[in-house]
Amino acid sequence: MIRMALKPLVAACLLASLSTAPQAAPSPYSTLVVFGDSLSDAGQFPDPAGPAGSTSRFTNRVGPTYQNGSGEIFGPTAPMLLGNQLGIAPGDLAASTSPVNAQQGIADGNNWAVGGYRTDQIYDSITAANGSLIERDNTLLRSRDGYLVDRARQGLGADPNALYYITGGGNDFLQGRILNDVQAQQAAGRLVDSVQALQQAGARYIVVWLLPDLGLTPATFGGPLQPFASQLSGTFNAELTAQLSQAGANVIPLNIPLLLKEGMANPASFGLAADQNLIGTCFSGNGCTMNPTYGINGSTPDPSKLLFNDSVHPTITGQRLIADYTYSLLSAPWELTLLPEMAHGTLRAYQDELRSQWQADWENWQNVGQWRGFVGGGGQRLDFDSQDSAASGDGNGYNLTLGGSYRIDEAWRAGVAAGFYRQKLEAGAKDSDYRMNSYMASAFVQYQENRWWADAALTGGYLDYDDLKRKFALGGGERSEKGDTNGHLWAFSARLGYDIAQQADSPWHLSPFVSADYARVEVDGYSEKGASATALDYDDQKRSSKRLGAGLQGKYAFGSDTQLFAEYAHEREYEDDTQDLTMSLNSLPGNRFTLEGYTPQDHLNRVSLGFSQKLAPELSLRGGYNWRKGEDDTQQSVSLALSLDF
């Protein structure tokens, strides 16, 4: 009875510990499936020193006392924190084969990592019958078929929409299975075998840890085994990355050894104590020297200030650092695939500016053989709502547009225009900052006769992304990665309409029309500056837009000097596939991977309102407001322009 009463309390405590990591809006993965060892174990083993019904994890307890028997559970491991950030169902983040959960009737989760597992056992937990074994003191507590065997029994392969997550290799060292370079390479190969088994079964996204430098852990630091452990860790990782680059799988590698070195070199940036020996001491004192200040029995117990809980396992702070690191890589394309959308948004604002000018001139062209020039300025705002694989963003900017047209005869005129646009976008949970300058030029032609009218424009542009700053949480701090790149665009647009008004000099005009638009934006690939564990290199991005639309435009003249005009159009986008972005860590250039990002809107509504006021016989003032709305995007712009006949 007591055990059953405490079960909800234990679950609530664990959920509370997870909730400290804010859940992000994008949620591109159906679930998170984890394989590995104690670094990822979500609670396969019972916790005899914890609350009834609790399970053990290889990190510190949540506090405030951190002591065994205190009623405090163990904190979450990195994949549990990551899953919470990705919006994965909490039950999916639980252990796969926990005897405690089975006894209590709690459904098994998707975390198959087991403390103590070697690379061969990790492979079995994926591929073997009875491959998931929970044993303590040579006693089998529970067994299950491996993940793929269990899925096959249900007629399923690997979930192609899931994120897979693998750690391993440390126990091959700790259990004496790696004593030389050849054995280190063989262990790395076994981990790659696990990756390939998942890939061949249909897995599309697989996160793989590089092994931490075992020479930089309390277990070996400062002792005679430190150089040996560091050397073999390096051999393992070199073989792992080499084989992964040839495995044919889409692998997101985590450069954990580099990340931890950065944390040790600048601990304050990660919220760690800068005045403590973070490698030679630990929190619990289990197999290592307890930190005298922040250790469990120190003067001020606080595991958040330390990297290691025991001789080889991170504190919750270390686990959160790794979760944030992984999330920063997975979320990068959610923001970076918005760069082409900044350009598309700017192009649409520029085209709206031209169309507003044309609408003000409708049935009111300059005389044959005469020029009409215009110059205008304005501002625009572009808002993106979050999607499954795209971040929310808020953009704003300003512009200068100028151009002119020449009337060839009664029915035709042609012209040119140019525009400069400055755009800024803040995106993601930490308001990453992306800035772009656009330089565009157009040639256009217009026709109006016998109530029919048409226009067509060809536009080209140069894009200067001069300040790109990706920001993200990292442990107890925040980091940004900077870069810059260029791009270009070209577009063609055309409209055809029929004026319902029977006379050209009618005070009102109303016209249905159809439209066709094509645009292509290309953003050059670039590398973020530096070679930190979080810096990325991105491939080129290309995003085309093909739209057909129909609408209604009208205008009304109040006398000979003042007119109001308006337009509504609905457009269908035919290039609406989710965008992919291929990238790699700067520190691991040979291991490229591809992730999903922004999905273009398949339907758009557009409204424009404006006025034109004649100031002198050859001089007019025009103002306008434009609004575009898709399912997840909103774009608005305002403008003011002068036109002069000469």
Curated annotation (Swiss-Prot):
PROSITE patterns, per database record: AUTOTRANSPORTER, LIPASE_GDSL_SER
Main localization, broad class: membrane
Positions of disulphide bridges: none
Subcellular location per the Swiss-Prot or TrEMBL entry: Cell outer membrane
Periplasmic side: 409-410, 448-451, 501-507, 559-561, 616-618
Bilayer topology term: Multi-pass membrane protein
Transmembrane segments annotated in the record for this chain: 398-408, 411-421, 438-447, 452-461, 489-500, 508-518, 548-558, 562-571, 606-615, 619-628, 637-646
First-level EC class: hydrolase
Superkingdom of the organism of origin: Bacteria
Residue ranges occupied by any Autotransporter domain in the UniProt entry: 366-646
Catalytic activity as recorded in UniProt: a carboxylic ester + H2O = an alcohol + a carboxylate + H(+)
GO biological process: bacterial-type flagellum-dependent cell motility; bacterial-type flagellum-dependent swarming motility; cell motility; glycolipid biosynthetic process; lipid biosynthetic process; single-species biofilm formation
GO function terms (MF aspect): carboxylesterase activity; carboxylic ester hydrolase activity; lipase activity
Enzyme Commission code: 3.1.1.1
Any one GO CC term of the record: cell outer membrane
InterPro entries: Autotransporte_beta, Autotransporte_beta_dom_sf, Esterase_EstP/EstA, GDSL, GDSL_lipolytic_enzyme, Lipase_autotranspt_EstA, Lipase_GDSL_AS, SGNH_hydro_sf
Keywords, comma-separated and alphabetical: Cell outer membrane, Hydrolase, Membrane, Serine esterase, Signal, Transmembrane, Transmembrane beta strand
Residues the record marks as active site: 38, 310, 313
UniProt-reported outcome of changing residue 38 to A: Loss of catalytic activity. Fails to complement the estA mutant phenotypes
Pfam assignment, any one: Lipase_GDSL
Ranges in the topological domain labelled Extracellular: 25-397, 422-437, 462-488, 519-547, 572-605, 629-636
Disruption phenotype: Strains lacking this gene produce only marginal amounts of extracellular rhamnolipids. They also show no swarming motility, and both other forms of surface motility, swimming and twitching, are completely absent in these mutant cells. Biofilm formation is also affected.
Protein role: Esterase whose enzymatic activity is required for rhamnolipid production, all kinds of cell motility (swimming, swarming, and twitching), and biofilm formation; the exact role of EstA in these processes is unclear. In vitro, has pronounced esterase activities towards p-nitrophenyl esters of short acyl chain length (C4-C6) and Tween detergents. Also shows relatively high activity towards beta-naphthyl butyrate, whereas its activities towards triacylglycerols and acyls-CoA are negligible.
Miscellaneous section: Overexpression of EstA results in an increased production of rhamnolipids. Rhamnolipid production is strongly influenced by the C/N ratio of the environment. At a C/N ratio of 83.2, a modified P.aeruginosa strain capable of overexpressing the estA gene can produce up to 3.9 times more rhamnolipids than the wild-type strain.
Domain characteristics, as noted in the entry: Contains a C-terminal autotransporter domain that integrates into the outer membrane and enables the translocation of the catalytic N-terminal domain to the bacterial cell surface.
Protein name: Esterase EstA
Organism: Pseudomonas aeruginosa (strain ATCC 15692 / DSM 22644 / CIP 104116 / JCM 14847 / LMG 12228 / 1C / PRS 101 / PAO1)
Upper taxonomic lineage: Bacteria, Pseudomonadati, Pseudomonadota, Gammaproteobacteria, Pseudomonadales
